[in-house]
Design a protein with these regions (language model features):
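A generic structural motif
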Residues: 7-13, 38, 213-218
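Active-site and donor-binding regions of nucleotide-sugar-utilizing enzymes
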Residues: 1-5, 45-147
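Structural beta-sheet core signal
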Residues: 14-16, 80, 103, 152, ...
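A nucleotide-sugar donor-handling region in carbohydrate enzymes
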Residues: 20-24, 126-201
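Short, surface-exposed alpha-helical segments at coil->helix boundaries
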Residues: 25-30, 116-119, 230-234
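Conserved nucleotide-sugar phosphate-binding/catalytic loop shared by glycosyltransferases and other
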Residues: 11-58, 65
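Cofactor-binding loop segments of dinucleotide-utilizing enzymes, especially the Rossmann-like FAD-
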Residues: 16-19, 106, 155, 223-225
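Donor-nucleotide binding loops and adjacent catalytic segments primarily
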Residues: 31-32, 65, 169-240
Length: 240
């Protein structure tokens, strides 16, 4: 986004939605604004809970809201990244408004997760593809995407890591007013959204194992707007 802003040939419109706007997920749109990135529109999907029915209803709200914005600005292309379910409404809206879609990080595989179907659906709705490596590029072509529209550009997050000024342990301790133990474990748990109830049992097993690591500092990453995310969050909070 920052590189596009530097190029006078491009005019970008940033649309922010879903968990970025939710207070319980940290209202992370403020981080976008603090990076001096202008947000053109904030679209709330009004997600009331982590139940499948509420997530499904929020997609309908998204299609209506995105259609209104895209019809007004009618960009030359819509750029999306990844496999978040919230991308489907904007892709459907773009398709029906005859706006081409560019998709980053297609062709990947996450078995056991709804992300698998979502990602491949977005790829089939898209016109230009920017996968992260040659394996993913070949998979897109095998799915029927035109080879001359598939560009292996590598993982864009690598540039973010390379250019980011990383914090040292002491800075984190001061900021959060904590003291790390000598050994640290970083834990991320992603529910298998196809079988969410099974995932909760799996998380309980993980926590039972982690309970044995008394001499470690355990850092859990937060949840996103996924099925059963509230249950995951509650289990982790009770554990810590």
């Amino acid at each position: 986004i920052k590189e596009i802003k530097k190029n006078p040939k491009f005019k970008s419109y940033i649309i922010v939605t879903a968990s970025h706007l939710e207070k319980r997920y940290g209202s992370t749109f403020k981080e976008i604004e603090s990076d001096k990135v202008k947000i053109h529109k904030k679209i709330s999907l009004k997600i009331k809970s982590d139940r499948i029915s509420d997530l499904s209803k929020s997609m309908a709200i998204g299609i209506t809201s995105f259609s209104k914005v895209l019809e007004k600005i009618h960009p030359d292309i819509v750029v999306v990244l990844g496999d978040r379910i919230e991308l489907l409404p904007i892709c459907y809206s773009s398709l029906l408004l005859n706006i081409p879609i560019a998709h980053f990080n297609g062709g990947e595989s996450t078995e056991g997760s709804m992300d698998e179907q979502v990602r491949h659906s977005i790829s089939k709705l898209s016109h230009v593809h920017f996968p992260a490596n040659e394996v993913y590029a070949k998979r897109l072509i095998m799915m029927g995407e035109a080879p001359n529209r598939v560009f292996n550009v590598g993982g864009t997050s690598v540039d973010n890591i390379k250019d980011k000024k990383l914090l040292i342990k002491k800075d984190i301790e001061i900021f959060y007013k904590i003291k790390f133990k000598q050994k640290i474990l970083l834990i991320t748990f992603h529910t298998a959204t196809i079988k969410p109830n099974q995932s909760i049992n799996e998380l309980k097993n993980v926590l039972n194992i982690l309970d044995k690591y008394k001499n470690y500092s355990l850092i859990f990453t937060g949840t996103n707007i996924d099925i059963k995310n509230n249950s995951v969050k509650k289990l982790i909070k009770n554990f810590v």
